[in-house]
């Protein structure tokens, strides 16, 4: 295995040698979506003739573990049928529990089998044009006390880019987990931690990010990798937002534009801030360009959301689309799902039940009963009303998010879930095929 330091040196040297033949953006709202034959093609946010909307899927649970996506990996630790005691809650503790070599063996088997070339062929055949691939900082570098398996994920990421290229798909690479965690979610790799902006952790995260930017912003990747997300879901309400901007986001932008002189597109998550919050940051007023704002939209992570009726859910979804129209940045809905419940096992984390059926309790937030989670993963036992509502909800979201740049649904496949699995939703005619097909048209008009 070539060392991270050596790979970084090679990537930087190569970037300096490559003539990227950049094309200046047409306007501050421009989006580089297609890069063909060394010529960038832009779509304009305010144009009625947008060349192509992003219609993508997330490859969640692959290079970053998530218990609810692949529960079998975590069930292997179960010793008690009555509770989840002893089951690792995230990838950090998964590796910590097994030790490096055994964790590497199990992870390598997972990486080798969960997504294969045929999945990319199928994704393309179903009309999608984009895959967003989450990866953790630990794929590229680790801290001395980290238990993570490192240096192996890049091989699979590169294979994914090759497969995407072969089948005409574009790729967003998404830094999904920061050192010390940027949100305390299990999908960051380390649950219940918020140390990302501490000096040691920030340095490690930036080291991984600059490597990703250096490698995947060169001409040999720009035909396929058309965006790099600086960080998934930094929890803005927990962090000092000015520090997040000035210590991480702006330095990353400056590194890409001024250090390695790349025109690669940057994707910036909204950090759970309201619409228009980011209008004055990297917005094009100072010759900045190529920054996309990523909004994530779910309606299942609070009792209030879960209690909404379908008309309310659809109204909220359509409002999300309208809300982006006044923003200065081009925007994409980088995550959303078909979920109408939080019933999927471990969706709320190992050790927690569902708010929907009243089995979830965390801190002072005691859930209450809304409905039953029985047969949630058996679509054959769903009522016709639930099937219809799921299709209506999906279609409304697709229409809402195509008001601007498009969407990337979370996620393409899971082991057991229906609500979070595009592949299964298509199989059961709950997700439109072709994507433009509508059983419930004009919901957002």
Curated annotation (Swiss-Prot):
SUPFAM superfamilies: (Trans)glycosidases. GO terms for cellular component: cell surface; extracellular region. It is an enzyme of class 3 (hydrolase). The active site is at 233 (proton donor), 335 (nucleophile). Residues 1-20 form the signal peptide. It comes from the Eukaryota. The keyword NAD does not apply. Its EC number is 3.2.1.58. Keywords: Cell wall biogenesis/degradation, Glycosidase, Hydrolase, Secreted, Signal, Sporulation. InterPro entries: Glyco_hydro_5 (IPR001547), Glyco_hydro_5_CS (IPR018087), Glycoside_hydrolase_SF (IPR017853), Glycosyl_hydrolase_5 (IPR050386). It catalyses: Successive hydrolysis of beta-D-glucose units from the non-reducing ends of (1->3)-beta-D-glucans, releasing alpha-glucose. GO terms for molecular function: glucan exo-1,3-beta-glucosidase activity. It is found in: Secreted. GO terms for biological process: cell wall organization; glucan catabolic process; sporulation resulting in formation of a cellular spore. Belongs to the glycosyl hydrolase 5 (cellulase A) family. Probably involved in the processes of spore formation and contributes to ascospore thermoresistance by participating in the morphogenesis of ascospore walls. The enzyme may do this by modifying glucan linkages in the developing ascospore wall, thus strengthening it or lending it plasticity. This is Sporulation-specific glucan 1,3-beta-glucosidase. The lineage of its organism: Eukaryota, Fungi, Dikarya, Ascomycota, Saccharomycotina. The gene is SPR1.
């Amino acid at each position: 295995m070539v060392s991270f330091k050596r790979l970084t040196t090679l990537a930087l040297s190569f970037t300096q040698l490559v003539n990227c033949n950049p094309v200046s953006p047409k306007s501050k709202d421009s989006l580089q979506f297609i890069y063909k034959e060394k010529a960038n093609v832009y779509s304009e946010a305010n144009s009625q003739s947008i060349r192509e909307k992003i219609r993508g899927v997330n490859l969640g649970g692959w290079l970053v573990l998530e218990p609810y996506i692949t529960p079998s990996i975590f069930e292997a630790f179960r010793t008690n049928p009555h509770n989840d005691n002893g089951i690792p809650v995230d990838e950090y503790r998964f590796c910590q529990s097994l030790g490096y070599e055994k964790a590497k063996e199990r992870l390598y088997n997972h990486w080798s089998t969960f997504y294969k070339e045929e999945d990319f062929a199928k994704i393309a055949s179903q009309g999608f044009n984009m895959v967003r691939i989450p990866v953790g900082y630990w794929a590229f570098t680790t801290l001395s006390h980290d238990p993570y398996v490192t240096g192996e994920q890049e091989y699979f990421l590169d294979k994914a880019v090759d497969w995407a290229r072969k089948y005409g798909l574009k790729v967003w690479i998404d830094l999904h987990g920061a050192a010390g965690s940027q949100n305390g979610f299990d999908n960051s790799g380390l649950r219940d931690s918020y140390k990302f902006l501490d000096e040691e952790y920030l340095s490690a995260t930036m080291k991984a990010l600059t490597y990703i930017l250096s490698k995947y912003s060169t001409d040999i990747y720009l035909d396929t990798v058309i965006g790099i997300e600086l960080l998934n879901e930094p929890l803005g309400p927990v962090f000092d937002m000015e520090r997040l901007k000035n210590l991480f986001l702006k330095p990353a932008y400056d590194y890409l534009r001024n250090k390695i002189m790349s025109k690669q597109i940057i994707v910036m998550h909204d950090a759970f801030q309201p619409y228009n919050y980011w209008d004055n940051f990297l917005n094009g007023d100072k010759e900045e360009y190529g920054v996309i704002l990523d909004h994530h939209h779910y309606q299942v992570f609070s009792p209030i959301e879960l209690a909404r009726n379908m008309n309310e859910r659809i109204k909220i979804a359509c409002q999300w689309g309208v809300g982006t129209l006044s923003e200065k940045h081009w925007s994409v809905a980088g995550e959303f799902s078909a979920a109408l419940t939080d019933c999927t096992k471990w969706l709320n984390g190992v050790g927690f039940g569902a708010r929907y059926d009243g089995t979830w309790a965390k801190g002072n937030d005691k859930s209450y009963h809304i409905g039953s989670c029985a047969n949630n993963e058996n679509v054959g036992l769903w009522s016709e009303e639930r099937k219809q509502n799921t299709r209506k909800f999906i279609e409304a979201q697709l229409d809402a998010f195509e008001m601007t740049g498009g969407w990337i649904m979370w996620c393409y496949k899971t082991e057991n879930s229906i609500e979070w699995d595009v592949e299964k939703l298509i199989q059961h005619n709950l997700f439109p095929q072709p994507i433009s097909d509508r059983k419930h048209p004009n919901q957002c008009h």
